[in-house]
């Protein structure tokens, strides 16, 4: 009933709009047609100049149309027009809010909304929907909650599309309970978009079971299941890894009659791949009447994740036979799997196919190639690919530095890291970059370089070291017989020392049998109130390695006891 009314209203709206446009002057009609064909700001500005020359810039309808088209192409140009309009109306304000909501400056929509309220114009639901879109993009919880309150007091919450926008806003901002509250307050005015939005919100916070419960509620309601809702449903099944659930979901798609939709076919292939039904995924793929590159990529990716790399290569050749042009995404997952399994032959075959297809070497694909070649032992090829890359991101640099380190070329790894800092101001090293450099220094015995890198990580980039970073530094100094230097380094860090660093050092003391330093570290942990029974056992082991069995026993008995673990079996 609701759908029929909505459809009738939409037809009436289109009919009235066409009637309205037919009543416009030929000059105005030509203006609208010209604006529809505009592709850039230059063309819009020419029409704007024509309007000023002919006096159409005083016509509210013509100016509204100019704003509507220019706000999509260039919001700043639209803003310059809007600022000079003396008689702004609600449509113009909504147009500007919408323009900002899809621009690079979504936060400016808030000031336009405030201007709209200050002018005293009557708001409509689109004023809220477009402003909420900006709130979602900027994660502005307080502003979004304020809009919710205004909409509630103004009586706009009866509109389903506004409620859907609110649910989306709360989901994006991680306030899933508030999103559910809005949903529960609208039992009679929900549609498929409402269910899909909230289901996606549950999936974002890893609450797959609640997403499935919501789908069951939808099935019991009068709301018709659509492709978007089914995609969310299949995603939840995939994340749960339930093969029997996947088969039931597949049957449901067939019953509803949407199993031939290309998006659903791709989702079904991915679902079966993730739930262990790779043969079922292949059957769906083979039976698909129509396939696009995304469908091919999905099947190849599922084979790659399952370790069936030869099947991936066969599919790549089949793509070429069927004249389906692959893209960079076709190769990325497969190359990563080759790197993980150290499958050099398959990796080179894939790389050769990539060369044949002349796929552009972007940052993601280039990084996958560098990583694959480095991990299968072909470092020279990795360097060649890295040097060919025009666009390199932090992952590209990190992959190449890691490759040097894995091949024992610590000096080259440090040199490349320094080059990254010097030549690429836009590329900022991350915690993983520092970890691979520290690891290379540790295995290469570059003590000074490693310490300098660690200090830069903390002092220049303000990263908080993790246990892996501390482990590399302690191992680096330990291999050089400089555990005391490691002690001083941790003690003098410009950040508040935590137990992670001291425990890494305590473990190193046990390896190298430095009992005195181990006692000092234990005292530090005690001063911090971070002692644990396992620390006493580590110290006991340190004394044992140092040849002090008495102290080893004393430490274990008196300084701490570790509770015994146990297993339990419940018997009915």
Swiss-Prot record:
Coiled coil: none
UniProt-listed GO biological process terms: RNA modification
Transit peptide start and end: 1-117
Superkingdom as given in the UniProt entry: Eukaryota
GO-annotated molecular function: RNA binding
UniProt KW keywords: Mitochondrion, Repeat, Transit peptide
Segments for region (Type E motif): 501-572
Residues making up the signal peptide according to the UniProt record: none
The name this protein goes by in its record: Pentatricopeptide repeat-containing protein At1g26900, mitochondrial
Lineage: Eukaryota, Viridiplantae, Streptophyta, Embryophyta, Tracheophyta
Record gene name: PCMP-E54
């Amino acid at each position: 009933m609701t759908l029929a009314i909505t459809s009738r209203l939409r037809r009436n709206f289109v009919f009235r709009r066409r009637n309205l446009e037919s009543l416009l002057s030929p000059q105005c009609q030509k203006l609208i047609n010209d604006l529809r064909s505009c592709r850039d700001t230059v063309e819009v500005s020419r029409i704007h100049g024509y309007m000023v020359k002919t006096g159409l810039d005083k016509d509210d309808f013509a100016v509204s149309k100019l704003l509507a088209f220019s706000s999509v192409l260039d919001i700043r140009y639209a803003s310059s027009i809007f600022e000079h309009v003396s008689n702004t109306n609600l449509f113009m304000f909504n147009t500007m809010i919408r323009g900002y909501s899809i621009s690079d400056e979504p936060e400016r929509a808030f000031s336009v909304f405030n201007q709209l309220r200050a002018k005293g114009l009557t708001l409509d639901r689109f004023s809220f929907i477009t402003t909420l879109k900006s709130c979602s993009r900027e994660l502005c919880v307080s502003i979004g909650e304020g809009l919710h309150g205004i909409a509630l007091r103004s009586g706009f919450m009866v509109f389903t599309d506004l409620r859907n926008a609110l649910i989306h806003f709360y989901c994006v901002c991680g306030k899933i309970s508030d999103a559910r509250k809005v949903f529960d307050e609208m039992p009679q005015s929900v549609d498929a978009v409402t269910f899909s939005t909230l289901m996606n919100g549950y999936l974002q916070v890893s609450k797959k079971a609640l997403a499935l419960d919501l789908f069951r509620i939808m099935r019991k309601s009068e709301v018709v299941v659509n492709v978007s809702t089914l995609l969310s449903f299949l995603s939840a099944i995939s994340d749960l890894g339930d093969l029997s659930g996947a088969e039931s979901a597949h049957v449901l798609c067939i019953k509803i009659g949407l199993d031939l939709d290309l998006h659903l076919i791709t989702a079904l292939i991915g679902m079966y791949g993730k739930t262990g039904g790779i043969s079922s995924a292949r059957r769906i793929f083979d039976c698909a009447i129509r396939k696009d590159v995304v469908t091919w990529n999905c099947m190849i990716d599922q084979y790659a994740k399952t370790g069936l790399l030869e099947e991936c290569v066969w599919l790549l050749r089949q793509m070429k036979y069927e004249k389906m042009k692959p893209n960079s995404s076709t190769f990325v997952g497969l190359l990563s799997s080759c790197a993980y399994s150290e499958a050099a032959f398959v990796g080179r075959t894939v790389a050769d196919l990539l060369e044949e297809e002349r796929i552009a070497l972007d940052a993601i694909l280039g990084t996958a190639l560098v990583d694959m070649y480095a991990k299968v032992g072909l470092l020279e090829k990795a360097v060649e690919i890295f040097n060919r890359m025009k666009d390199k991101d932090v992952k590209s640099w990190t992959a190449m530095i890691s490759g040097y380190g894995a091949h024992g070329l610590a000096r080259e790894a440090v040199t490349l890291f320094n080059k990254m800092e010097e030549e690429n101001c836009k590329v900022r090293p991350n915690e993983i970059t520092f970890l691979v450099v520290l690891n290379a220094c540790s295995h290469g015995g570059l003590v000074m370089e490693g310490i300098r890198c660690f200090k830069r990580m903390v002092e220049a980039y303000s990263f908080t070291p993790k246990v892996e970073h501390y482990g590399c530094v302690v191992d680096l100094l330990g291999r050089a017989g400089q555990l005391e230097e490691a002690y001083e380094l941790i003690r003098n860090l410009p950040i508040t020392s935590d137990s992670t660093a001291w425990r890494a050092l305590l473990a190193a003391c046990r390896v190298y049998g430095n009992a005195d330093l181990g006692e000092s570290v234990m005292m530090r942990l005690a001063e911090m109130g971070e002692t644990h029974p396992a620390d006493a056992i580590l110290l006991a082991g340190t004394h044992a390695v140092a040849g002090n069995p008495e102290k080893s026993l004393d430490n274990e008995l008196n300084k701490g006891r570790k509770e015994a673990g146990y297993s339990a079996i419940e018997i009915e």
